[in-house]
Amino acid sequence: RNTVHYDALIYVASWPEPRIAAWDALLKARAIENMAYCIGVNRTGIDGNGHNYPGHSAVYDVLGNRLVFSDREEILYATLHKEHIRENREKFRFLADGDSFVLT
């Protein structure tokens, strides 16, 4: 399990069009469950096998709100606020509920 010693998660991926709804849902879920900004970068275009990659690059805040989104090749910008993370981690303290353990 991840620890909470980070403020942003970055995922670089190649999710094809038939599965893009899962990509969108997972990015939002990762932001919420980790109380961290989630930055997802997905490829665009068509590969050599004819599979379409529709982008859906996005940034989500700690509450799962989508800040920016693109379904094409472009540069996205988002401002991330450390205070927003701190306030929400203080308000929703579930990250402190995790147990530390080792599997052997």
Language model segments and positions:
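Active-site beta-loop-alpha substructure in enzyme catalytic cores
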Residues: 1-34, 38-40
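C-terminal beta-strand edge segments of enzyme domains
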Residues: 43-104
